[in-house]
Swiss-Prot record:
This is Serine--tRNA ligase. PROSITE patterns: AA_TRNA_LIGASE_II. Gene3D superfamilies: Bira Bifunctional Protein, Domain 2, Serine-tRNA synthetase, tRNA binding domain. The keyword Lipoprotein does not apply. Its main location: cytoplasm. HAMAP family: Ser_tRNA_synth_type1. It is found in: Cytoplasm.
């Protein structure tokens, strides 16, 4: 959640920054109005409470002096009713403000490029040169079918479209990639954790998926439980509503989970293959840091994901996202896009974001430094999306006969 005090202090500046994310000015103006209404409600309550305190003192004096308290008692009783009404009004105004504020995205950093969508993102650099093939490279779904690694039709039979089943070497490679990624991240100082695949509403509100993106989530009927869209949600919320001692920071974690997304806004996009699935495997990085550490940790997380791709000999590039393409909770993001020769294009395989204190405010994650409690910064990023890594291996390591060479670093994981 954005800092409402910051918005009050300089509404126009914050409004201008949020407009770079495409936030409607009317929404921000409405937030300002709700905030003013809450301030008025608080003043009304405090005024009535002050009057009550004054009358209570008078009541004691009246009784001590033996004076008639009938009229004063009637005023006290009447004021109690007004206080209860004022407190209820204040609660309603507070809830209205907080609900609206939960729908406002994070403020982008000043150095985030201007732009409306992915076409305005800025390439930082390319890493490794794509291989030149002496034949026309095939796309991954053709290779997966030819080698018997992945069956999309059986995925549909078991569930619906955008599900798949892995067999034989395809399944073994997925398992090998998960272990390789976790080991790689652990060696970079990220502690491995294992978390639930179901979370409650508070966890999703903490990391920013709710209330805005509920249509993209799978919910358990009759319960306030949701399948996780990313490990970012449970891992970040491990420290929800806690005050951490400064010596514990930074906390750096890595986790493997299955992820579940309805992809409600992806109709017609990547309808074939494994690029966009309702269920997929991912290894995540999450860091919880002091504010002054977060930029350094951000660069470290980007480098970890890039080095992992390089270890797998997969050509990729780093891209800085523009304001219009930034995620809801991100203050800044660098995407890593892997080269897919079958598609003759770079495709996203990792997204590393610094949310600053945005998620920490929502999830109430703070740290104590001396006598002061402050909000931490939280960061997250894929390292890596397992299915898309498998896609990249199939396309980049394919041979003319359709067979696929396995990257050397995975050999120990495949006996």
């Amino acid at each position: 959640m954005i800092d409402l005090k910051l918005l009050q202090k300089d509404f126009q500046t914050i409004s201008n920054k949020l407009s770079r994310k495409g936030v409607d000015a009317d929404l921000l103006e409405n937030l300002k109005i709700r905030n003013e209404e809450l301030k008025v409600a608080k003043v009304a309550y405090e005024t009535l409470q002050a009057a009550q305190n004054s009358m209570s003192k008078d009541f004691g004096i009246y009784k001590k002096e033996g004076r008639d308290t009938t009229e004063l008692k009637a005023k006290v009783d009447e004021n109690k009713i007004k206080i209860a009404e004022a407190l209820d009004t204040q609660r309603i105004k507070q809830e209205a403000l907080e609900y609206l504020a939960m729908s406002i995205p994070n403020i982008p950093d000043d150095d985030v490029p201007d732009g409306k969508d992915e076409n305005d993102n800025v390439e930082i650099k390319k890493v490794l040169t794509p291989k030149e093939f002496s034949f026309t490279p095939k796309e991954h779904w053709e290779l997966a079918g030819q080698n018997g690694w992945i069956d999309f039709e059986r995925g549909v039979k078991l569930a619906t479209s955008r599900f798949s089943v892995s067999f034989g070497m395809g399944a073994k490679l997925e398992r090998a990639l998960i272990n390789f990624m976790l080991n790689f991240n652990s060696k970079r100082g990220f502690e491995e954790v294992s978390v639930p695949s179901l979370v409650n509403r508070a966890a999703l509100e903490g990391t920013g998926q709710l209330p805005k993106f509920e249509d993209d989530l799978y919910k358990i009927q009759g319960q306030e439980l949701f399948l996780i869209p990313t490990a970012e949600v449970p891992v970040t919320n491990l420290y929800q509503d806690e005050i951490l001692h400064v010596e514990r920071l930074p906390i750096k974690m890595t986790a493997y989970t299955s992820c579940f997304r309805k992809e409600a806004g992806a109709a017609g996009r990547d309808t074939r293959g494994m690029i966009r699935q309702h269920q997929f495997h991912k290894v995540e990085l999450v860091s919880i840091t002091k504010p002054q550490q977060s930029d350094e940790i951000f660069d470290e997380m980007v480098q970890t994901a890039s080095d992992l791709l390089s270890a797998l000999e997969l050509p990729h590039r780093l891209v800085r996202l523009c304001g219009g393409d930034l995620g809801f909770g991100a203050a800044k993001t660098v995407d890593l896009e892997v080269w897919l020769p079958g598609q003759n294009a770079y495709r996203e395989i990792s997204s590393v974001s610094n949310t600053r204190e945005f998620q920490a405010r929502r999830a109430k994650i703070r740290f104590k430094d001396g006598d002061k409690n402050s909000f931490v910064h939280t960061l997250n990023g894929s390292s890596l999306a397992v299915g898309r890594t498998l896609v990249a291996i199939m396309e980049n390591f394919q041979n003319e006969d359709g067979s696929i060479t396995i990257p050397k670093v995975l050999s120990p994981y495949l006996n």
